[in-house]
Structure formats: structure tokens, C-alpha cells
């Protein structure tokens, strides 16, 4: 049997990149945030609704309050690279989960190379990256669904090593 590093089924890749922009209120501000995400990703964003009513914050149940977009493939890698350049290719160890995912936030969307528009304003956003190995589709498919083995799961250490090798990033 070949070494684990040479095995094609052991390669780690980006499954998806989710960019979330939570405004906290519906209306014109949320529409502007959706426009920013559409310009960034080239895809139509989806609105998220509040789960509960919180009177002290002025949030009603089912009120639109955030917008997010899911990006896959090469476009996800390009946008992730732009986001990591804003963070100077440095992430904290806390940013990595035990299941092989990581996330980080940026304060201003104009740092990604987008042009500033005074009528739109400035929005911060969260980047969430889901990593996977080939063969994880067996857990998501509709017919003959089965479990992914523990050897095929991505650990926190493997995720950090992948980040360091792919993006030459630092983890502190």
C-alpha cells in the first residue's frame, strides 16, 4: 500500500466557502449588504431570518437580518485568498474547529479590493471554510447513504497543516 501522502483519497480540498454578513436589521441596510456580497461573489446571496423574537434588541421572529452566499470551486479559493491577505495570512488556533473547518472575520469589505461607494457604506463579514476529502459524498447523497469513516475525517491538526502548506500562513 502506498504512503498516505501519495494517496489521492487523502488529499484535502475546499468543499465550500460561506461568506456571512449580519446587519442585525431588515430594510435598506440589508439590501446594500446583499449588493456588496453579490459584487464580491458574482452570485445571488440568500437572506437569513431571525429564529426568535428578542425585544431588547428590537428583533422580531422571521425578520430578515443577515445575508450569506455559498461559493464552491476555484472561485472559492480566489476569494478566500483575498480574505486571507486582509488577515495577512495569520489566523489564531481558535479559528480552527475540531472537525476540520475554520473561519475568520474582516472589518471592512473594501479591504478585499472592492471600490468604496459612499451610498453603500462599509460592511464587515465572516468567512467560513469547510474542508473535505474525496469520498465524503457518501454521507450526503440521497440513495445508499452511509457514514464517513474516522480515517477520512479531517482533524484540527490536519486542517492547520493544510492551511500552512496551501497558503503559507501562520497560526498563533
Swiss-Prot record:
Cleavable signal peptide: none
Compartment(s) of residence: Nucleus; Cytoplasm
Keywords for this protein: Cytoplasm, Nucleus, Ribonucleoprotein, Ribosomal protein, RNA-binding, rRNA-binding
UniProt cross-references to InterPro entries, sorted A to Z: Ribosomal_uL5 (IPR002132), Ribosomal_uL5_C (IPR031309), Ribosomal_uL5_CS (IPR020929), Ribosomal_uL5_dom_sf (IPR022803), Ribosomal_uL5_N (IPR031310)
GO MF term (any one): structural constituent of ribosome
Chief location category: nucleus
UniProt GO cellular component terms: cytoplasm; nucleus; ribonucleoprotein complex; ribosome
Entry annotated with the keyword Ribonucleoprotein: yes
GO BP annotation list: translation
Gene3D superfamilies associated with the record: 3.30.1440.10
Keyword Acetylation: no
Domain of life: Eukaryota
SUPFAM superfamilies listed in its UniProt record: RL5-like (SSF55282)
Family classification: Belongs to the universal ribosomal protein uL5 family.
Complex formation: Component of the large ribosomal subunit.
Function: Component of the ribosome, a large ribonucleoprotein complex responsible for the synthesis of proteins in the cell. The small ribosomal subunit (SSU) binds messenger RNAs (mRNAs) and translates the encoded message by selecting cognate aminoacyl-transfer RNA (tRNA) molecules. The large subunit (LSU) contains the ribosomal catalytic site termed the peptidyl transferase center (PTC), which catalyzes the formation of peptide bonds, thereby polymerizing the amino acids delivered by tRNAs into a polypeptide chain.
Name of the protein this chain belongs to: Large ribosomal subunit protein uL5
Organism, as annotated: Tetrahymena thermophila
Amino acid at each position: 500500500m502506498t504512503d498516505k501522502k501519495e494517496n489521492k483519497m487523502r488529499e484535502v480540498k475546499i468543499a465550500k466557502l460561506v461568506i456571512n454578513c449580519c446587519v442585525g436589521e431588515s430594510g435598506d441596510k440589508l439590501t446594500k449588504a446583499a449588493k456588496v456580497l453579490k459584487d464580491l461573489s458574482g452570485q445571488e446571496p440568500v437572506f437569513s431570518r431571525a429564529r426568535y423574537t428578542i425585544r431588547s434588541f428590537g428583533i422580531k421572529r422571521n425578520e430578515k437580518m443577515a445575508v450569506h452566499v455559498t461559493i464552491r470551486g476555484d472561485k472559492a479559493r480566489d476569494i478566500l485568498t483575498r480574505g486571507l491577505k486582509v488577515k495577512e495570512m495569520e489566523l489564531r488556533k481558535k479559528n480552527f474547529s475540531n472537525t476540520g473547518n475554520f473561519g475568520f472575520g474582516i472589518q471592512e469589505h473594501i479591504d478585499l479590493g472592492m471600490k468604496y461607494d459612499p451610498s453603500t457604506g462599509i460592511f464587515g463579514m465572516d468567512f467560513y471554510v469547510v474542508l473535505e476529502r474525496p469520498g465524503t459524498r457518501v454521507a450526503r447523497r440521497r440513495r445508499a447513504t452511509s457514514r464517513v469513516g474516522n480515517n477520512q475525517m479531517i482533524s484540527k491538526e490536519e486542517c492547520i497543516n493544510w492551511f500552512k502548506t496551501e497558503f503559507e500562513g501562520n497560526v498563533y
